[in-house]
């Protein structure tokens, strides 16, 4: 496995913009004969951070997958063995984390094993005080292949209470249409002494 990347940042002479990043990163997985099994190359073109702390970005990527056996995408759509290469593009934004309310969103399109994949996501974070946190997130995926079409939703929410440095209650609720199930994880933590919970 090989991986690497690089980034260049500059600070334009503009009142609203703090910095602009452009970069590239990726990885390559090969077999023992150095034949490609998986490759992912991603370009930030660009990522802009404003003085307030908000960010917007545009990403372009190239991906290659070489499955040696047929398999099911998302457990439902048949993908034959072969050599697949596709492009993808994604744009998104995120508001500053310095405020009690933080929102973000993204939308992307890519090829996908001879077909296409569209993804739209959004998230919301509200922390009016250090002792309370609420988040909500949703992601929609559409996969279109010669063998069929699939829509999936993943929705999640967190509700956390931090009563003191030693006592907290964290809750995660999650639902996805692929499995059709709702999951709830709740954890109460009380540190009686350092290193013990």
PLM regions and their residue ranges:
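Exposed, low-structure sequence patches enriched in small/polar residues
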Residues: 1-197
């Amino acid at each position: 496995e090989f991986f690497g990347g690089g980034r260049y940042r500059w600070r334009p002479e503009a009142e609203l913009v703090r910095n602009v990043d452009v970069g590239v990163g990726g990885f390559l997985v090969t077999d023992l004969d150095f034949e490609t099994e998986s490759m992912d190359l991603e370009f930030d073109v660009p990522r802009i951070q404003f003085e307030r702390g908000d960010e917007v970005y545009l990403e372009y990527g190239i991906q290659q997958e070489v499955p040696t056996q047929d398999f099911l995408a998302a457990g439902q759509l048949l993908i034959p063995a072969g050599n697949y290469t596709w492009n993808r593009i994604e744009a998104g934004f995120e508001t500053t984390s310095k405020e009690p309310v933080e929102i973000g969103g993204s939308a992307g399109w890519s090829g996908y094993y001879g077909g296409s994949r569209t993804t739209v996501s959004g998230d919301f974070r509200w922390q009016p005080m250090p002792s309370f946190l609420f988040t909500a997130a949703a992601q929609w995926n559409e996969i279109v292949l010669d063998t069929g079409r699939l829509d999936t939703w993943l929705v999640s929410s967190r509700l956390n209470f931090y009563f003191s440095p030693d006592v907290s209650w964290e809750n995660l609720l999650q639902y996805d249409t692929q499995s059709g199930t709702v999951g709830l994880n709740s954890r109460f933590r009380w540190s009686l002494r350092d290193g013990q919970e």
